[in-house]
Amino acid sequence: MNYIGLSAYDTANGPGVRVSLFVSGCTLRCKGCFNKESWSFTAGRPFTAETEAQIMKALDSKWIAGFSLLGGDPFESEHEAVLAGLLERIKERFPEKTVWAWTGRTFKHVEKSRLLPYIDRLVDGAYVQKLHLAKQGAWRGSSN
């Protein structure tokens, strides 16, 4: 699995200050997507043990509220094994931190995912450009 971004101090993707991972790869390709560079599964860098160590170190602070998982689309089947393991380890080590995840798929399409048991808030559904939300803090791109 590759990723295109890792932010240790993100305030745009969930409540409070968060650690955010942007995975590479999305087959949905929503019109108007804000993150088109993430569509390719080979974009960015490989996710390694060192990447996970960076995430764990960043989460190990009282003022970090949680972990946000974005993309690309974290629910692409190619990501499931790596991300399920990562989320399990995050929840074991930091049970007080919330995990948020975004997907362009609906809940019905991801309800059997191995990621769901570790996610506290799922923001689901494809981005619809004509329903764009400009309000900061809405935590989703469109109102659908």
PLM regions and their residue ranges:
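Conserved Radical SAM active-site core
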Residues: 1-6, 17, 35-100, 107-112
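N-terminal pre-triad scaffold of radical SAM enzymes
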Residues: 2-29
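A structural signal for short, well-ordered beta-strand segments and their strand-loop junctions
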Residues: 100-101, 123
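Hydrophobic pocket-lining residues within nucleotide cofactor-binding pockets
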Residues: 26, 74, 106, 127
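Short glycine- and Lys/Arg-enriched binding-loop motifs that mark or flank ligand-binding interfaces
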Residues: 10-12, 67-68, 121
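Classical nucleotidyltransferase
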Residues: 116-144
